[in-house]
């Protein structure tokens, strides 16, 4: 890995639109469920220094807010609930020497009047091993490893229930290893977070499982849990208050926003603790269409998710190591492997496997924009999805057919006369869990000629390319037969957008959709200048048109539709010449 090891990465279950984001210094990560950005939570992963009340932690926290001030008077606010009888709170500024010599600071609210305080490890003390499905940090006597396995999601129409449960359980696995073999004293380690959901309180999972699970969570949506009896759960206003309570009974305090799991490792021992980091969203989660997460068919709540994950953790860890090989065993160079591993993680962090009227519905959200099944990205992710689970490609294509297909007319720029157009598809299916109305995207506006205009022609060729690749990869002849009439419609629509006079066609787009209402169509390069942004007579789009024509020619010839194949062949030839 390169010099900079402090970058955020997604650590995501498949199809849960969730990520445990971690890696950048400060409070820049945490439990991300359906968000457009990292949640900026304090994540606490640390270990007590031998024979001291100083704790060293991985640097994934910043200034912590003490919720106590909301409940107490100004005089009471300066009193700390601790064994030492503390009198004042202050802000600690801890300097970290970076590799380039620049002094940076991580701020965290600590209790300077006691001997308990938390410092981050220095950058030079930390190493990181980053792969497609595992991510490990090592510093001092601790190591912290995350497993976010990914595997093929079985087709729900064919799979057994257990296969699907294993593939889409909404959780990842963490391991914290403490090496106290050289220590002279028992040392305490911790794993916790400061939640920032204003609508949910921190809670203990032991309360709802009769003590079977040890864990902390915020509301019903996120949790850290273990089956390890060596671990104790705790919650309080601050992490420091958890590490030095007045009495241990106070660790079950209900008002604080910090929750943590505590572990004591005796001198001379090395111990590993395993945790499930879980997500759950029950009930309907979208508007426009009433959908729920597919995993809710198998798991009734987050406790159920945690229990299943921990009992199947060995299998999930084995899956993670196998998933690493997809990248590590490739012939790519190291930079390419890094980018692919990052891309895979980001992809799964955006996947949303939903249930609509008892049928599967697959969504990939567009990163921070959260637009749903943006077609420009569906075609980009096509080959990975075909490799991993081709049925999701068909599912997306069918969603475009049944709800996000429309018909238009076309016209030349500056001319209101309309000519036959044909079928096309929307840019996306909605945004931020709000499905858009049938036949319309969340993105596309009318009467524009730049960003936010319609992408009618590009989405038409995207549907053709995705459908052709799916058919070629799977050999799904039944689906091909069902879609042949639509394929013919797509051909008619493409040539109509070239020129209404067959003799004047050149194989590329020449007319704009009536949906532009006097404006002009754009391409996926919507934020660039007219050389790439304008769809009409665009060489970039011409390349996609040529590919679509080549694909259609093969499909029609294989289906015995030779007249249609000849029409396509003419456009293919003209497009390649231009």
Residue positions per predicted region:
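Active-site neighborhood of glycoside hydrolase catalytic domains
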Residues: 533-578
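Extracellular-facing/secreted segment signature in eukaryotic proteins
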Residues: 75-76, 83-85, 94-95, 101, ...
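Acidic/polar, glycine-enriched structural segments that form the non-catalytic walls/loops
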Residues: 2-19, 98, 103, 134, ...
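Active-site-proximal structural scaffolding
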Residues: 10-13, 24, 36-38, 60, ...
């Amino acid at each position: 890995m390169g010099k900079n090891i402090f970058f955020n990465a997604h650590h995501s279950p498949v199809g849960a639109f969730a990520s445990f984001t971690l890696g950048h210094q400060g409070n820049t990560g945490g439990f991300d469920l359906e968000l457009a950005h990292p949640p900026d939570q304090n994540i606490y992963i640390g270990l007590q220094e031998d024979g001291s009340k100083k704790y060293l932690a991985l640097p994934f926290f910043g200034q912590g807010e003490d919720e106590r001030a909301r409940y107490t008077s100004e005089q009471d606010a300066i009193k700390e609930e601790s064994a030492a009888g503390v009198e004042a709170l202050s802000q600690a500024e801890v300097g970290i020497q970076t590799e380039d010599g620049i002094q940076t600071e991580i701020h965290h609210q600590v209790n300077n009047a006691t001997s308990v305080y938390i410092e981050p490890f220095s950058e030079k003390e930390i190493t990181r091993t980053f792969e497609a499905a595992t991510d490990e940090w090592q510093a001092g006597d601790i190591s912290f490893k995350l497993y976010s396995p990914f595997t093929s999601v079985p087709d729900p129409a064919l799979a057994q229930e257990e296969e699907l449960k294993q593939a889409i359980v909404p959780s990842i696995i963490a391991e914290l290893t403490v090496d106290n073999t050289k220590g002279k004293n028992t040392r305490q380690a911790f794993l916790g977070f400061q939640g920032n959901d204003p609508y949910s309180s921190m809670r203990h999972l032991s309360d709802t499982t009769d003590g079977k699970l040890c864990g902390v969570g915020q509301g019903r949506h996120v949790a850290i849990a273990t089956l390890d009896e060596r671990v104790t759960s705790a919650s309080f206003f601050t992490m420091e208050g958890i590490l030095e309570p007045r009495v241990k009974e106070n660790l079950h305090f209900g008002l604080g926003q910090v929750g943590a799991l505590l572990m004591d490792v005796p001198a001379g021992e090395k111990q590993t603790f395993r945790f499930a980091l879980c997500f759950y969203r029950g009930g309907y989660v979208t508007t426009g269409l009433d959908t729920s997460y597919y995993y809710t068919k198998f798991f009734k709540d987050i406790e159920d998710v945690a229990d299943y994950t921990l009992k199947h953790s060995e299998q999930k860890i084995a899956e993670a190591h196998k998933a690493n090989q997809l990248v590590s065993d490739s012939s790519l160079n190291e930079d390419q492997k890094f980018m692919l591993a990052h891309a895979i993680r980001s992809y799964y962090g955006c996947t949303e496997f939903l249930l609509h009227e008892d049928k599967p519905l697959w969504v990939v959200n567009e990163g921070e924009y959260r637009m749903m099944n943006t077609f420009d990205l569906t075609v980009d992710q096509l080959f990975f999805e075909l490799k991993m689970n081709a049925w999701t490609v068909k599912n997306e294509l069918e969603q475009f057919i049944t709800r996000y297909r429309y018909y238009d007319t076309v016209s030349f720029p500056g001319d209101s006369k309309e000519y036959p157009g044909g079928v096309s598809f929307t840019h996306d299916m909605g945004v931020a869990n709000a499905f858009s109305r049938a036949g319309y995207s969340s993105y596309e506006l009318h009467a524009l000629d730049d960003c936010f205009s319609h992408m009618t022609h590009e989405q038409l060729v995207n549907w053709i390319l995705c459908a052709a690749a799916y058919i070629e990869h799977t050999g799904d002849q039944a689906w091909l037969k069902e879609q042949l009439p639509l394929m013919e419609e797509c051909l008619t629509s493409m040539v109509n957008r070239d020129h209404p006079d067959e003799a004047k066609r050149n194989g590329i787009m020449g007319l704009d959709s009536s949906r532009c209402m006097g404006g002009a169509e754009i391409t996926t390069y919507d934020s660039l200048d007219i050389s790439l942004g304008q769809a009409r007579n665009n060489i970039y789009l011409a390349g996609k048109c040529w590919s679509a024509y080549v694909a259609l020619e093969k499909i029609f010839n294989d289906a015995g539709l030779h007249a249609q194949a000849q029409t396509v062949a003419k456009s293919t030839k003209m497009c390649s010449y231009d």
